[in-house]
Amino acid sequence: MKRTLLNVCLAAVPLAVGGEGLPVPIVWQVNAKTLARRQYIKDIDYLRAHTAADILSPAPVEGTVQGDMDQMRAPMRELAAYARAKGFRVALRTDYSTPGFFAAPAFPSAHGLSVKGPLPNIIKDQAQAQALTVDVEGRLDGTGYACLRSEAKWNREKIIPLYAKPLAAYVFEKAGAGFYRPGSLEDVSACMRVVAQDNRSMSVELDLGAPYAGKDVFLLAGHFFNALEIYEAQYADFQKTFDGFADAALDGAVNDEQGFMPVDAWGGEPFRGRYFSFAGERYWREALKTDFRRLLFDMRYAPAGDAAVRIRAINRYFDEARRVTMAFEDAVADYQLARYSDPFLACHSTYHNSLDSDDFIKNTCNYWSLPRDYGFTDEGTIWPIRLGVLLGSKMKFGYNMFYSKNPDDVYGNIIDCAPWRIREFHHAYNDGRWGLGYTEQPFTANVKKLDEAVRLLDGFQRRGALPRTDVLLVFGEFAHANWYPDEKARGKWDQNASLRIMEKAQEAWRAGHVAALLPDRLVEEGRLRFEDGAFALYPIARTTACDRRAAFNAPPARFRKLVFLYPRYAKRCVWDFLNGAAAKGAALVVVGPADLDVNAEKASFAGRRVAEWDLAKIAAELQLASSRIPGGCVYEDGSFALVSDAILTGRPTKIDLAIDGRRFTGHHTGVLAFRKGEALVATAGSKLFCDGQNVGTPRPDRP
């Protein structure tokens, strides 16, 4: 049977975790120069000598094509074997939504296209291309005629348009903004005639005759781009590539920022497109028994007096986008689990690290649900999201990929993350574009020094408690996805921008409350529950896509207090979760309207609810603690860890903390971790006193 995302099921392979030391991964940008004269051998020797990394993630960039076996198979086989001999694991970085984005093969002249920068690798089977829809509206003239023109938009510059195709046309009588008179809607797609067309635009005529004179018309135009659609083509490309590397000593795939084709609305008009592909349409028709083109129209218009049609259509589109992005992630994880003994499943789907950015479009902000053992984020992801992602992971550790051309920014990321059970995924050796390339000194030596110092915490944190979290913030994904019917709330990325969920989480964090942010899809997944008087967050089940809910085989993170932001349009299981917890006396407050479910049917919440966000009021209502400390993290059992730039400067950092009624004073020289009844874990020269009493002599912990 052909392997597609319509049918994904492989046997699970158990995870084997050895030792207490956490992996130290680094992206390695592999370009044409890397392959020339086996430069990668020298690069591996350099990385072994000058970094603390133990996982290499080669990333094909300019001049290389990840799926070109003639170019990549032999070098990757030798690269992986030599790296393994030098003590590295190798996980190939992948990108399947934009084939050839950085490649430069001969450009097919038949396309007659022009593009700035490196020439792209054109998709051979254009039925595999991803499309964005463009809505074109007009009015039929006195003879029932209209000519409508559509032009490709919202694509990033290097993702070039390949062709345009009219998908559907409807005529109706408008009954106000976004409504039509019931009974007036007619599908006239069979009458569409393309009269002008190139790769970027097309003109479509409708000539319906005098009976249609003056009626409104809606054209759903599809513009297909040089990007693989996600339902079948992306996984097929992944499988072909990794099957081609079957004889290379790889340890997994770094599935980086995967999802739908990237879009662009940063400087221009707001994004109002929808994704379309022929494979996706087939899934809607066969599995969901739905006319997908009609659903795309229903997302824009509803019969007068029945706004629920539009609400349901928007929610259904978003729900399926969630499913298919996760189906691809599950399929890639299943492939690795079936073929590698202990794959390093990585990495993040944070794209621009914001719920109110194109992350919402590209992968539905699925950060918390990726089938990984560790939690992955990147760059400037806010702390409540970082904490929520790591607490929902199996290993209860996170990685934040980071790059900058400023060394101090990189040092700061490593230092700030470490107390919170987060390590840096370094980016990138041989980086010629985004940040430093790990050949600069003293930068590279300093990063190695930081990595080695932070490893003192590995064993301490593995054996210890989780970060003390004052409040769990859960937001309603459908409320965030669906602005309708409030036009004023409609954001640049076609989401509900009025909720400002991240701003609220940041406000709580800056007020000193340790807050973890999660979406309510974790309730749907069976991972967030109320049990034994607390909210329990179970880890992602490392198993097949067939039954991800079954393997709750690792202990959950537990929270006493929860604030639910905006339950409108939530699924019934979420309403049951909220009302069930409230009935059992949970410390729970709901913020915002609580009136409708995902199908626009009536719903209600019987517990404590406030109409608007008011942190002071909510903090008083729930008696929220403020557990943040400067330069470190307090854990659930009262233990704590501190990390500072003293690792590099040699200047001791002063300690003066009050935790659980005890006062801790002294100083540390970069890393210090304390747990009652255990020897102090710290860098040399550190001293710690508890209520004036010396707590003991520091000893380095075993990584």
Pin down the residues of each PLM region.
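Glycine-rich loops and low-complexity Gly/Arg-rich segments
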Residues: 116-118, 371-372, 587-588
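Eukaryotic long, low-complexity intrinsically disordered regulatory regions enriched in serine/proline
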Residues: 366-374
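Mature N-terminal, pre-catalytic/accessory segment of carbohydrate-active enzymes
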Residues: 5-261, 335, 633, 681-703
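"Short basic amphipathic alpha-helical interaction patches in structured regions
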Residues: 106, 269-270
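Carbohydrate-binding surfaces of carbohydrate-active enzymes
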Residues: 22, 34-36, 40, 55-57, ...
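Secretory pathway export signals and precursors
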Residues: 4-5, 542
